Amino acid sequence: MLQKPEKLDLDRQVLKPLLADGLLYAYQSPEYVKDMGTPERYEMVQRDIRSGLVSARNLSNPQKAVFLDRDGTINKYVGFLRSAEQMELLPQAAQAIRKLNEAGWLVILATNQPVIARGEVSEEELTEIHNKLETLLGKEGAYVDAIYYCPHHPDKGFAGERPEYKIECSCRKPKPGLLFRAAQDYHIDLKKSWMVGDSAADMGAGKAAGCKTAGVYGEKSGDESFATLAEFAAFLCGREKA
């Protein structure tokens, strides 16, 4: 029997029931995804198509990225950060990342987390910390496209350590392994990308990967240096408009 047409809310009435039944699957992608269920959003998507943004974000094309260190670059440095409660953004960090998002840069976190090897933080607890970071960014309209971390540390012989992570690895900055992994996953052109951080290890990783480098908050060994992440974002986005 034919039923009378009725309006449905795609999210609440179709997708959420499928999710509850375990019948909905998804994957994370930095490619262009936009809800265009209103005339205003439809016009925005049309503009993005005409500008070439939709095509440019397709991962079949090489991408440009800004790799960001975490502690002391995005959030306040507190030594070994061990809980989500310690996560606090630096002033203007979210606004800087939002500016990079809006300018079409992939924003990828690349961070050393030896607290895993030290046995002080579990992988699940680190996920909670990063969830808090992403929530704080999201409240300001900003986001990171991916998070890569190194759990290793080469120094051995400490109480509570996890021996499987006490190794010489290729991903602990200043080695470039995290950046290489991201480049493979997201088709990133490293020569057109930047590594930004507050330490010489960040600058070393960026240079080893073939990226341009920018030190912030006092780090001077990069190709460029800026007082804050916000100043870097203004420089990069302003240069593209020039």
Predicted region positions:
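Asp-based, Mg2+/Mn2+-dependent phosphohydrolase catalytic module
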Residues: 124, 128-145, 155-157, 162-195, ...
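Substrate-recognition element of Asp-dependent hydrolases with the DxDx(T/V) motif
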Residues: 93, 97-136, 143-156, 206
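Active-site neighborhood of HAD-like aspartate-dependent phosphohydrolases
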Residues: 63-107
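Catalytic-core segments of class I nucleotidyltransferases/pyrophosphorylases
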Residues: 1-55
